[in-house]
């Protein structure tokens, strides 16, 4: 009998060891590649592709990031001149070849515009009754135009009011300014050197663009998207219809596509070899969950261009800090963005269709046509899926209707059946078909509650551990969910075993995903939200897995046949010992011997011509051969085989004919699609959000997202988990204990994952006070300040009056800054006239005034008012009706930026007598002289150049003495702000 049992071993049977091994292999085979994709950047090619020089690009990046280069710094001017030199060196061979060639049609014309003329006054538009911020900015953008082979040959921009003809061109944008506290390797140095390589690529013979290509090296993005705004005043802004914006919101890794305008333009990103990104991030912006903005909002929202946002998203702890340098990124990251830029741009400039040249609905925007909302995501970093949101909606509606109908019309047989009545006698035969029906929702809710409780626990005890240990958090939640679900499922199976556990589990999963898909479909239709696209595939997999469970039931005998057989009323020729019920399933008075072996008496008949060669045997739906009732000599041993090869342990006896391999098919239909789509989303989300706590965002959102995604990823395991052996759950329980202890007691920051704090030094020129402030999260902020020598022994004042959520701002009297430039006296004493000069002239009898302001060794100042002014105008400024400088809310602050150092701005302002009055230049003199006509505020200038040690000693001191797990970033436009108070009456 041993050899017989060995032959019956099935490596894919629904028994503990096959289930444990196969399920583990499937999950590891999918999760490991997903982890690799999110953690490892594809290698750059060893040899340069045609038209690209990666070595040159890396050297350019190293030069660009040799110092801090914010707009308000001398090094920014050096970078500007260096870029012009690099551009000219790249296009020089093309220009010289064109001059020597008689057939210049094959060589693209290249035009370089050093835009030092454009300026603009605009505002942020305001929200509700909030006063807006007005901005005046002078351009230092560099614009390169590569004429396409199908472009108008006329230099139309040289004519006044000249307009382009033909199809619109393509804009690729990156900003060459950095923040004052970061070297800007990924924000946005890689974008800048990618533009240089795009220039080289499209001026290489054979790579000529069909449509014109505009490369915008914009300056001033970090402070208020100023460079993109002022680009709107250049003639080429009317030529481009599509765009690709290169950005950085992290400091390395892969460049992610995290926002696009429509389906049609997104398809061109599919040309890249290593796509990466999801529509989830785009919907985060749409729903207001992500508040930081890029030049994308200017190109699309104001100019009406259609395009894509490509950016680095992690790690945010290095973003805007001194670790955003070439040491902490790689040539692989550079190649990932560059290759995506080349693939996308090449597709856009080669496109000959009319999708991007239709009439615009807004006459103030370019005629770029109208796109459709899209759904897009990558798969394993090698394939890219993109389709219309309307397609998602239509398929979702169809599946929501068809799937339940298919399930409903499929014969459920033993499902939901407790017993079967015998015809004629009325006897009830127990089927136990409802056993296992209610356990799934109870266990799933319990298992899901645990990660949510853990999220609350971490938020209360150690809220920032995810900052440096996101995978420890993931491991804790995964192990807790799986162990608890396994324990409860095994307990339920022990006390009430059921062969229908899998069918009921898939049914509940089907119901839950159906509800979620309904909600997602409503949001997709009404709000245009596509982030739940994975639910369509999740539901489709759940539907197919559920349907298979229902189709399995066709392998069972009919309930009536089983009932008659258990009471001995079926003919012996149709009977089988393997359909025997246990004693507690029989509610009739039939004798056990008759019920168990109803055909024993008539089995030894003589064979005839019609007798089967496999006499006494039958084949089940699962292709298991079972013996019929043979001789009494082997009855005991054969009964033992039946128990091992038929029903599993104490499950319903009618279940022996159920297929034993279909669980593998169900696993493969549901688990891979869930792991691929949901797994990538989970890692993408946590990688981009795990370090937002240092920005004042609640980390509970991150932990809650981990808990939800843990459940979504583990649900495909649940129908099978009661068959697991104890080995893996026990191991995971130990993992849970270890990671829980670590997550509760470990210090959340490290030199590789630093806590970001925000620095500013404010000098009050009225009283000579000098205040240094750091903004961050407590109690870590206090620990950092206690390590600073100049703060020792001082009364540190802290408050939460910041716009950054949970952050606190702590201040003390700091070291005096030396920002007035070389050749001037050291600023050990605050002399107001050396810092800012300003003059205010009020118009007699009116609520009008002219303010002249200038700062020493700076080109950035601002005016802040205690109450909003109605209107303002900067002398010599252009105004664009698409971006009005004021609104009915009024202007509370005016920011002034100049391309010229120590420039004097002349600003005319007027203000209302009260918040309810409209502007009226003919108001009575008595009203204007009344106290309510008094306007007070501050004249402020800013300094942002920290390249030389000793210029801002307080900043040098913080960097030198702060703990290694502290990073310093800017708190405002300037590192140092000096202010004068004024009153106009």
Curated annotation (Swiss-Prot):
Q: Which organism is it from?
A: Ajellomyces capsulatus (strain G186AR / H82 / ATCC MYA-2454 / RMSCC 2432) (Darling's disease fungus)
Mind telling me which residues the site (Transition state stabilizer) is annotated on? Answer: 319
Q: Does the keyword Aminoacyl-tRNA synthetase apply?
A: no
Please list the residues that bind Zn(2+) 2: 187, 222, 320
**What is the name attached to this protein's record?**
Vacuolar membrane protease
Q: Cross-referenced CDD domains, in alphabetical order? A: M28_Fxna_like
Where in the sequence is the active site?
221 (proton acceptor)
Where in or outside the cell? Vacuole membrane
Please state what class of enzyme this protein is.
hydrolase
Q: Where is this region: Disordered?
A: 563-612
For bias type Low complexity, the affected ranges are 566-582
Q: Tell me which parts of the chain lie in the Vacuolar compartment.
A: 42-388, 462-470, 524-527, 688-700, 749-985
Keywords from the named record: Glycoprotein, Hydrolase, Membrane, Metal-binding, Metalloprotease, Protease, Transmembrane, Transmembrane helix, Vacuole, Zinc
Which GO molecular-function terms appear in the entry? metal ion binding; metalloexopeptidase activity
TM region(s), chain numbering = 21-41, 389-409, 441-461, 471-491, 503-523, 528-548, 667-687, 701-721, 728-748
Q: Which family does it belong to?
A: Belongs to the peptidase M28 family.
């Amino acid at each position: 009998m041993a050899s017989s049992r060995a032959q019956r071993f099935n490596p894919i049977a629904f028994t503990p060891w096959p289930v444990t091994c196969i399920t583990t292999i499937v999950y590891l085979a999918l999760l490991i590649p997903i982890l690799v994709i999110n953690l490892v950047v594809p290698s750059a090619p060893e040899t340069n592709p045609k038209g690209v020089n990666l070595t040159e690009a890396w050297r350019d990046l190293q030069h660009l990031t040799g110092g801090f280069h914010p707009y308000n710094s001398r090094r920014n001017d050096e970078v500007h001149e260096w870029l012009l030199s690099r551009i000219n060196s790249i296009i020089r061979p093309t220009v010289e070849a064109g001059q020597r060639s008689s057939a210049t049609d094959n060589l693209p014309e290249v035009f370089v515009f050093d835009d030092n003329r454009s300026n603009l006054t605009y505002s942020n538009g305001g929200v509700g009754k909030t006063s807006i911020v007005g901005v005046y900015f002078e351009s230092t953008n560099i614009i390169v135009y590569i004429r396409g082979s199908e472009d108008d040959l006329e230099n139309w921009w040289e004519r006044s009011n000249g307009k382009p003809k033909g199809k619109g061109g393509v804009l690729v944008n990156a900003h060459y300014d950095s923040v004052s506290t970061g070297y800007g390797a990924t924000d946005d140095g890689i974008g800048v050197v990618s533009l240089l390589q795009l220039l080289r690529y499209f001026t290489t013979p054979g790579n000529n663009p069909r449509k014109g290509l505009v490369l915008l090296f914009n300056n001033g993005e970090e402070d208020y998207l100023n460079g993109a705004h002022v680009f709107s005043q250049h003639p080429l802004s009317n030529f481009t219809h599509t765009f690709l914006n290169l950005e950085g919101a992290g400091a390395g890794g892969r460049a992610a596509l995290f926002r696009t305008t429509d389906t049609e333009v997104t398809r061109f990103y599919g040309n890249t070899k290593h796509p990466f990104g999801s529509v989830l991030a785009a919907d985060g912006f749409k729903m207001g969950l992500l508040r930081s903005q890029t030049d994308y909002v200017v190109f699309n929202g104001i100019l009406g261009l259609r395009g894509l946002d490509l950016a680095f998203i992690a790690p945010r702890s290095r973003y805007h800090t001194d670790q955003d340098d070439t040491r902490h990124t790689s040539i692989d990251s550079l190649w990932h963005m560059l290759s995506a830029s080349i693939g996308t741009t090449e597709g856009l400039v080669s496109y000959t269709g009319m999708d991007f040249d239709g009439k615009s609905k807004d006459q103030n925007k370019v005629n770029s046509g109208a796109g459709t909302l899209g759904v897009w995501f990558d798969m394993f970093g090698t394939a890219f899926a993109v389709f219309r949101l309307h397609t998602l909606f239509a398929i979702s509606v169809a599946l929501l209707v068809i799937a339940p109908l298919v399930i409903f019309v499929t014969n459920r047989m033993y499902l939901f059946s407790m017993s079967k009545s015998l015809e004629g006698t009325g006897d009830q035969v127990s089927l136990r078909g409802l056993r296992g029906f209610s356990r799934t929702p109870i266990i799933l809710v319990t298992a899901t509650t645990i990660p949510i409780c853990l999220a609350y626990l971490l938020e209360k005890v150690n809220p920032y551990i995810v900052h440096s240990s996101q995978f420890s958090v993931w491991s804790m939640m995964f192990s807790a969910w799986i162990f608890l679900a396994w324990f409860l499922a095994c307990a339920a199976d022990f006390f009430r075993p059921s062969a229908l556990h899998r069918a009921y589990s898939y049914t509940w999963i089907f119901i839950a995903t159906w509800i979620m898909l309904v909600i997602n479909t409503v949001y997709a239709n009404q709000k245009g939200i596509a982030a739940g696209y994975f639910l369509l595939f999740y539901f489709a997999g759940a539907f197919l897995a559920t349907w298979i469970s229902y189709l399995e039931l066709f392998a069972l005998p009919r309930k009536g046949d089983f009932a008659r057989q258990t009471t001995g009323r079926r003919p012996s020729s149709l009977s089988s010992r393997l359909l025997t019920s246990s004693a507690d399933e029989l509610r009739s008075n039939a004798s056990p011997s008759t019920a168990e072996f109803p055909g024993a008496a008539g089995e030894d008949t003589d064979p005839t011509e019609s007798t089967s060669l496999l006499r006494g045997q039958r084949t089940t739906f699962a292709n298991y051969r079972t013996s019929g009732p043979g001789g009494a000599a082997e009855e005991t041993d054969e009964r033992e085989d039946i128990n091992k090869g038929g029903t599993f342990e104490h499950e319903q006896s009618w279940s022996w004919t159920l297929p034993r391999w279909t669980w593998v098919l169900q696993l493969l239909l549901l688990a891979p699609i869930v792991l691929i789509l949901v797994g990538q989303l989970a890692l993408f989300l946590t990688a981009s959000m795990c370090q937002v706590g240092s920005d004042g965002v609640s980390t509970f959102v991150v932990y809650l997202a981990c808990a939800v995604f843990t459940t979504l990823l583990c649900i495909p395991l649940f129908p099978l988990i009661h068959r697991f052996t104890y080995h893996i759950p026990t191991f995971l329980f130990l993992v849970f204990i270890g990671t829980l202890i670590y997550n509760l007691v470990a210090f959340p920051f490290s030199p590789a994952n630093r806590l970001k704090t925000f620095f500013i030094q404010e000098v009050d020129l009225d009283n000579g006070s000098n205040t240094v402030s750091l903004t961050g999260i407590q109690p870590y902020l206090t620990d950092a300040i206690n390590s600073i020598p100049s703060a020792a022994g001082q009364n540190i004042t802290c408050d939460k009056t910041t716009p950054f959520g949970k952050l606190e701002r702590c201040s003390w009297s700091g070291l005096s800054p030396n920002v007035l430039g070389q050749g001037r006296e050291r600023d050990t004493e605050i002399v107001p006239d050396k810092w800012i000069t300003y003059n205010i002239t009020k118009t007699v009898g009116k609520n009008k005034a002219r303010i002249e302001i200038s700062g020493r060794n700076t080109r950035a100042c601002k005016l802040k008012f205690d109450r909003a002014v109605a209107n303002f105008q900067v002398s010599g400024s252009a105004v664009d009706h698409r971006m009005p400088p004021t609104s009915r809310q009024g202007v509370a602050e005016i920011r002034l930026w100049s391309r010229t150092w120590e420039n004097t701005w002349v600003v005319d302002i007027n203000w209302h007598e009260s918040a309810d009055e409209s502007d009226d230049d003919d108001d009575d003199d008595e009203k204007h002289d009344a106290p309510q006509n008094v306007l007070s505020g501050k004249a402020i200038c800013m300094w942002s150049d920290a390249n030389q040690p000793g210029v801002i000693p307080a900043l040098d001191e913080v960097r030198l003495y702060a703990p290694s797990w502290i990073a310093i970033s800017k708190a405002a436009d300037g590192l140092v702000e000096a202010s004068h108070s004024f009153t106009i009456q």
